[in-house]
Amino acid sequence: MENSEPTRGAPRAIVAMSPSLDPTIGIVVCIPCFRRPEHLRQTLQSLTDQHTDRRFAVVMVENDASACGSVPVASAFLRSGKLPGLCVVEPRQGNCQAINAAFETAQAIFIDATHFLMIDDDEIASAEWLERMVGAAEVTGADVVGGPVLQRFGDEAKRGLQRHPAFRPTYEASGPVPIIYGCGNCLIKRPVFEKLGSPAFDLRFNFLGGGDVDFFSRSRRIGMKFYWIEEAVIFEAVPDSRTRPSWIALRGLRIGAINYHVQRKVALTPWLRARLAVKVLALLPLSLCRAMYLFLTEWKPLIALHPMIVAAGGLLAAIGIEPQPYKASKITS
């Protein structure tokens, strides 16, 4: 796994801020941004339309420092007074750099904030999203709350892909869960960040992705409690490019690589590393059985192949071969 660039270098810069920003706001929604200004406009509008009496702010992080395409959209919303908050440019490129910048800025500016939510810049929050997420955190006492991300496909003929493991939500009912895996619809309480230390997202996952899986895995190991709220829905715009078999296969390889590296981090002894190697090899024949079962139940070859592709991704990562989809050169939109 390739390490990211060092954390030193050009500083972050606040490039837009709403008038009379109140640092005592207790809820902050963080939005990493990269080359999707029109989608960001819809994301921000969905936050403006939230059905809640709770005061909240937004922190947007532009991670394309050369073009800064998201900044005009962010500035317009902030200047209009529709949403309180600010926009920061993070010049160090990468998924984890952007997310760390968002959470670190939110904690530093909003010193009384206790609840930090995240939504991606290609997602739209349902009207009750924030109220349900924060309410679940308050009622259950959970340290981390997650909710479903449902796809909106540009091509309606592709809606069947919602059953594919690469798109399907992890859980289907509200309640306590052992862990969540994605940060595209999550709430994290401040003590989680304080206990895990900085940077929150390990920069070794900066270009591969999976910093969220690693973060939540570490949270579970120190005893943090997780809760899933099925009604706190976020919708994700899925372009046609992400419905191609090649993209879905690459995502499966990436999932396998992420799973391997998260486990490799805690395999600190020769015995544990040997056991992990055996597990990686054993997953290949086991994945074939799983693939046969999925084919017989789903009758979709693309779905059935997923376990085998994930297993292959883990094996390839073990020998140093892995995708890096969050490098700027690999991102088109």
Regions of interest found by a model, annotated:
Residues 2-46:
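N-proximal low-complexity "stem/linker" segments adjacent to membrane-targeting elements
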Residues 45-56:
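Short, acidic, metal-binding catalytic loop of nucleotide-sugar glycosyltransferases
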Residues 62-73, 123:
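A conserved acidic beta->alpha catalytic loop
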Residues 147-148, 162-179:
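Short, flexible, basic/aromatic active-site loop/helix in glycosyltransferases
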Residues 171-188, 206-208:
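A recurrent flexible, glycine/aromatic-enriched loop bordering the glycosyltransferase active site
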Residues 206-217:
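Acidic donor-binding loop at a coil-to-helix junction in glycosyltransferase catalytic cores
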Residues 250-257, 268-333:
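Non-catalytic, C-terminal membrane-associated alpha-helical segments of glycosyltransferases
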